[in-house]
Amino acid sequence: MAHSLRKTRKLRGHVSHGHGRIGKHRKHPGGRGNAGGQHHHRINRDKYHPGYFGKVGMRVFHLNKNHHYCPTVNVDRLWALVPEEQKTKVSAEKAPVIDCVKAGYFKVLGKGLLPKQPLIVKAKFFSHEAENKIKAAGGACILVA
């Protein structure tokens, strides 16, 4: 539908002319876009975008990480990982559970002898010999991620 009057004609006599009282149709008093981020808009940046400005340290690019980290424990040391109070409660039916990963060992190796007491061993890796010795004593090997 066509109008007989343009908006400017309609707004004649209204002081603010449709641009509000406060800003009074002034351009960009705070600057355009991200202007003043380190100056007059600093509080906003610090509150809502912490860490936006400033330097970032260097990555230690020459640090050689050991990707083959795998501490080992032998079969003859497994009983040393069982707490003393648990050793007294051990019976033929109830085997103690040894978590090698919690003790700081990833792999169980087969050196040494095991007593004829069954035990349940949790580790990331087992050598064949260690697995055979633990199973021969009536125990079990459980792989843990």
Swiss-Prot record:
InterPro entries: Ribosomal_uL15, Ribosomal_uL15/eL18, Ribosomal_uL15/eL18_sf, Ribosomal_uL15_CS
One cellular component (GO) term of this entry: cytoplasmic side of rough endoplasmic reticulum membrane
A single GO BP: translation
Entries under Gene3D superfamilies matching the protein: 3.100.10.10
Subcellular localization: Cytoplasm, Cytosol; Cytoplasm; Rough endoplasmic reticulum
Family affiliation: Belongs to the universal ribosomal protein uL15 family.
Alphabetic keyword roster: Cytoplasm, Endoplasmic reticulum, Ribonucleoprotein, Ribosomal protein
Function field: Component of the large ribosomal subunit.
Subunit: Component of the large ribosomal subunit.
Segments of this protein annotated with the region Disordered: 1-48
Domain of life: Eukaryota
Biased composition (Basic residues): 1-30
Name this protein carries in UniProt: Large ribosomal subunit protein uL15
A GO molecular function held by the record: structural constituent of ribosome
